[in-house]
């Protein structure tokens, strides 16, 4: 079981604070976490934590933050195929009351072309749409090789249309629907019209809807994590993507309802922890979340 992930990497600095300073004010945060970040990157770490052999093609810098990122990947036995940038990208994440504000500093001025790997050795490819040229190349190569392709559609990007035509599973956010000016149900039809086999829209605390090639729309509610246990919702969607991929790779013939049920429990675990790394689930944590918060399996 192995998968290739293609996306943009960050170092996330997450801080819990009751007051956001302004002007010349200073405040002290209640807690903080420093971790890896990025949509496909966090999904890759999730898959690795769940025992999947994971390769990652992502941006990497030579500065000390880039070195720290590579050490994180090494800790989880993730093989990295770096695309060089001058500086590591940063995200400052401020979670509060079930929401999260994010301020990013991104370096996407690539100093090297992306590596062209043989995708035929993988069982799945997951993209977040970043590294536009690499995303298009790899999704087409995977389709030609018969490798399952998965897209995290957090937002419309310049390459989204081209990528969708070679995507098997597209799980998009509400923001994606809003950019299209479509309802969630209309977005499912939009995705299927472009050849997507499994189309899904995540709706936060309301859960998700999805449909397969027969067009039948199904709903899966989110597990109810009490407000007092919700610490940091950032990265929960990325963990969701990584978990459904892990579930699929373990049992490709199982229904997608099973894969998505597994993934929602993984997300329920994540939101109880500060930062992406602390929130990575293992199978025991996913089972616990199901039992505690009302999962079916």
Please provide the spans of the model-predicted regions.
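Glycine-rich phosphate/adenosyl-contacting loop at the front of the ribokinase-like
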Residues: 1-55, 67, 297
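Hydrophobic anchor at the start of a short beta-strand
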Residues: 3, 54, 80, 149, ...
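Active-site metal-binding loops of divalent metal-dependent hydrolases
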Residues: 9, 130, 239
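Conserved N-terminal subdomain of the carbohydrate kinase-like
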Residues: 24-27, 34, 49-124, 287-297
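Anion (oxyanion) recognition and catalysis
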Residues: 48, 74, 143-144, 192-193
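Structural alpha-helical scaffold elements that stabilize or flank donor/cofactor-binding regions
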Residues: 117-118, 162-163, 192
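Conserved beta-alpha-beta core of the PfkB/ribokinase-like small-molecule kinase fold
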Residues: 123-187, 207
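Conserved phosphate-binding/catalytic region of the ribokinase-like
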Residues: 184-297
